[in-house]
């Protein structure tokens, strides 16, 4: 837009063109996915996050955000009753976690890490250099997901150019992806 608009016009457009077609995740009768910012605390947290929104991708870019992520990761580990080896504050510094903006972002990051780890392991085993390993092995990698997995699994495989095999799970086994299913 080259010229500003009156706020009433902006809100009218928002009401007519956005709100009419939106799925209202905050509606008390919406059970399709997961709760959103429906509480006072959630709204306040969103407001504070928006006020300090900056690229928190590493400590140099945003020390406060990175340190806060470490504190929150420890809180979650403690709330889940995980051993201290999972804590960022553990002296060995082997613990920790990351906070992502979405399931898709976390799935993609996990798959990239798994892909790179697999390619490195192949290089170690075969003695091939990294470029040869990528050329030879990248198209052979397969990502496995259960038929109950989040849609971000298939999306991630497509983004990374990986084969994706969807494997069945059953209620009988509490929808767990089992070793015998993977071996087939």
Identify what each model region corresponds to:
Residues 69, 73, 89-137, 152-156:
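Conserved beta-loop-alpha segment that forms the PLP phosphate-binding cup at the N-terminus of a helix
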Residues 4, 34, 62, 100, ...:
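Hydrophobic alpha-helical scaffolding
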Residues 66, 70, 74, 111, ...:
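C-terminal structured subdomain/cap of oxidoreductase catalytic cores
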Residues 40, 64-65, 99-106, 145, ...:
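Secondary-structure capping and boundary motifs in well-ordered enzyme cores
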Residues 117, 121-127, 131-184:
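PLP-dependent aminotransferase-class I/II
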Residues 52-60, 86-98, 135-140, 163-171:
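Glycine- and acidic
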Residues 1-94:
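N-terminal entrance/gating region of PLP-dependent enzymes' catalytic architecture
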């Amino acid at each position: 837009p080259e010229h500003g608009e009156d706020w009433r016009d902006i809100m009218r457009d928002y009401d007519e063109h956005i709100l009419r077609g939106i799925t209202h995740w905050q509606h008390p009768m919406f059970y399709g996915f997961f709760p959103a910012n429906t509480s006072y605390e959630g709204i306040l947290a969103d407001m504070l996050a928006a006020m300090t929104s900056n690229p928190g991708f590493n400590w140099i870019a945003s020390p406060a955000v990175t340190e806060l992520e470490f504190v929150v990761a420890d809180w979650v580990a403690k709330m889940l009753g995980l051993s201290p080896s999972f804590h960022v504050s553990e002296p060995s510094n082997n613990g920790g976690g990351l906070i992502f903006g979405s399931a898709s972002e976390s799935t993609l990051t996990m798959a990239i890490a798994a892909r790179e780890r697999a390619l490195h392991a192949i290089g170690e085993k075969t003695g091939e250099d990294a470029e040869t390993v990528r050329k030879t092995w990248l198209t052979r990698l397969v990502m496995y997901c259960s038929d109950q997995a989040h849609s971000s699994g298939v999306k991630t495989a497509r983004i990374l150019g990986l084969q994706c095999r969807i494997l069945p799970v059953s209620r009988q086994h509490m929808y767990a992806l089992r070793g015998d299913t993977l071996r087939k």
